[in-house]
Amino acid sequence: MNTEASQDQTVTETPGVRLRQARESLGLTQQTVAERLCLKVSTIRDIEEDNAQANLASTFHRGYIRSYAKLVHLPEDELLPILEKQAPVRAAKVAPMQSFSLGKKHKKRDGWLMSFTWLIVLVVLGLTGAWWWQNHQAQQAEIANMVDQSSAQLSQNGGQPVPLTDDNRDAIAPTDAPAPVANGQPVPLTNHSVSAITNSAPTTSSVPTTSSATTSSVPTTSSVPKINSTEPVDTANTNTTMHQEGAASAAVSPSQVPQPGMPTGQPPLPTADAGVSGSASSVGALVMNFTADCWLQVVDATGKTLFSGIQKGGAVLNLAGKAPYKLTIGAPGALTISYQGNPVDLSKFIKANRVARLTVGVE
């Protein structure tokens, strides 16, 4: 009997039973208690049935019981000893702190990645610089080769650049021998001499030629008596012959002036100066003004090389041929070009500081 009474007393001494009895004595319902404590009805029911929620921390569970005891006017000192035996305070599980080594590993990996990225950037910059340097060296070597070729041509042509045209090739006629002289007086020109002089005249735009005036003003051997060294020469005939010879030379080429050191009986070869001066008025004319020494090569549409050599600063070169023209310029900044009165843009070649290869006159 004593054992059963002690068991009943133990049952009645649980916190949930004490709280339910106190609530019922005050005439409160579980719903009223839940509203006053701002809790769920299920939470009040679990407290009265001594069911501890698994997902609820013991600290919150003890706090709910204290609030419930205050509401039903039960002293906390009577409930706390029983509550500690029924639901002891569980130690909170503290997660171990992560070591800083993980962050160090991340930083180390990021450092290697940045180093590899910078290495790639440096390699790309190095390759770009090497490529630019190779192109620069190739351009300089090409310019040097052009200058060497031009120097060789100048040395072969007696220090003057000669435009390579068909007219200049025809100008080199077999007239190496000086004009015959009889008793210190010039002999009238023959038909062969007149044709040689006519062919030797340059045919650029700045040098006019009149073959009709030449042939009409020069006497032939059939109308001039032969001069013998033993016979006296008539002064009047000699003067007439000299005047006729002067008229013939004036009709052949008014712009030619005998070069010093050149035989008087041989017509001078056309040089680059034959194409310099004057304004280009013909269709397809190409005008180049040089501000500094520059190597130049001009080829027309037929493949004829109109000019190849070095021009000095201050010179003006006029060329006429069949368009379009293919130009190769060693120093684009040393000249200005106009085609049919319109300037040709060389700015992209000047900025690039390289040999200019362009075609002018393409329709």
Curated annotation (Swiss-Prot):
<keyword id="KW-1003">Cell membrane</keyword>
<comment type="function">
    <text>Cytoskeletal protein that is involved in cell-shape control through regulation of the length of the long axis.</text>
</comment>
<keyword id="KW-0997">Cell inner membrane</keyword>
<protein>
    <recommendedName>
        <fullName>Cytoskeleton protein RodZ</fullName>
    </recommendedName>
</protein>
<dbReference type="InterPro" id="IPR023690">
    <property type="entry name" value="RodZ"/>
</dbReference>
<dbReference type="GO" id="GO:0003677">
    <property type="term" value="F:DNA binding"/>
</dbReference>
<dbReference type="InterPro" id="IPR025194">
    <property type="entry name" value="RodZ-like_C"/>
</dbReference>
<feature type="compositionally biased region" description="Polar residues">
    <location>
        <begin position="188"/>
        <end position="199"/>
    </location>
</feature>
<keyword id="KW-0238">DNA-binding</keyword>
<feature type="compositionally biased region" description="Polar residues">
    <location>
        <begin position="226"/>
        <end position="243"/>
    </location>
</feature>
<feature type="topological domain" description="Periplasmic">
    <location>
        <begin position="133"/>
        <end position="363"/>
    </location>
</feature>
<feature type="region of interest" description="Disordered">
    <location>
        <begin position="151"/>
        <end position="277"/>
    </location>
</feature>
<comment type="similarity">
    <text>Belongs to the RodZ family.</text>
</comment>
<keyword id="KW-0133">Cell shape</keyword>
<dbReference type="InterPro" id="IPR010982">
    <property type="entry name" value="Lambda_DNA-bd_dom_sf"/>
</dbReference>
<dbReference type="InterPro" id="IPR001387">
    <property type="entry name" value="Cro/C1-type_HTH"/>
</dbReference>
<feature type="topological domain" description="Cytoplasmic">
    <location>
        <begin position="1"/>
        <end position="111"/>
    </location>
</feature>
<keyword id="KW-0735">Signal-anchor</keyword>
<keyword id="KW-0812">Transmembrane</keyword>
<keyword id="KW-0472">Membrane</keyword>
<dbReference type="GO" id="GO:0005886">
    <property type="term" value="C:plasma membrane"/>
</dbReference>
<keyword id="KW-1133">Transmembrane helix</keyword>
<feature type="DNA-binding region" description="H-T-H motif">
    <location>
        <begin position="30"/>
        <end position="49"/>
    </location>
</feature>
<dbReference type="Pfam" id="PF13413">
    <property type="entry name" value="HTH_25"/>
</dbReference>
<feature type="domain" description="HTH cro/C1-type">
    <location>
        <begin position="19"/>
        <end position="79"/>
    </location>
</feature>
<feature type="compositionally biased region" description="Low complexity">
    <location>
        <begin position="200"/>
        <end position="225"/>
    </location>
</feature>
<dbReference type="GO" id="GO:0008360">
    <property type="term" value="P:regulation of cell shape"/>
</dbReference>
<feature type="compositionally biased region" description="Low complexity">
    <location>
        <begin position="247"/>
        <end position="259"/>
    </location>
</feature>
<feature type="transmembrane region" description="Helical; Signal-anchor for type II membrane protein">
    <location>
        <begin position="112"/>
        <end position="132"/>
    </location>
</feature>
<dbReference type="InterPro" id="IPR050400">
    <property type="entry name" value="Bact_Cytoskel_RodZ"/>
</dbReference>
<dbReference type="Pfam" id="PF13464">
    <property type="entry name" value="RodZ_C"/>
</dbReference>
